[in-house]
């Protein structure tokens, strides 16, 4: 496997970008020459006729990564739908060779890559008459292990166990699970963590509390500073 990790979520809006940014912040703070990569992003915001990929901007700002967004994210779409559909609507075909070459350029410059997926593991990236490419195929293309981000709330046991089984059946390796939005005082959250660990046999490497304001970088950094950095670093092989 290449020197990096691919962050996957049990669903869209589960906290992948938040966790990705936090992990990259920790790595860079502790002297690791690490970067971000996201193959395709939908739902970008247009500012002065320029599309700004929100996830890429958030991760870069939080971690102190200073790169052109296009270097980190080769495909950026304004339409807020799955990449395969945004690609079709905007008439911009997604080319796997472009994704691979873009990733390799980032890899040449940095020692470790924290890559982020789009949506969940079965998110379609390309769909045409010739083929259907899912997020799992992008992970295989980049030859990376995965780290799964799951919710702490109701329904998480089912979503997480199914995602783990799917990832394993796809022949991919899961290094661990991060539970996002966790409240120690919530009996459901505590039991979810216990059952997820039992049913998946995967290490839960971090329990991250809910953040009131995702734009408060000072608060976010404190949350990640309070985590067990050595455990995270060892888990992802950074």
Swiss-Prot record:
Name listed for the protein in its UniProt record: ATP-dependent dethiobiotin synthetase BioD
Which positions in this protein are listed as binding ATP?
A: 13-18, 55, 116-119, 209-211, 216
The source's superkingdom equals: Bacteria
Q: What does this protein do?
A: Catalyzes a mechanistically unusual reaction, the ATP-dependent insertion of CO2 between the N7 and N8 nitrogen atoms of 7,8-diaminopelargonic acid (DAPA, also called 7,8-diammoniononanoate) to form a ureido ring.
Write down any Gene Ontology CC term: cytosol
Q: Where is the active site?
A: 38
Amino-acid positions noted as binding substrate in the UniProt annotation, renumbered to this chain: 42
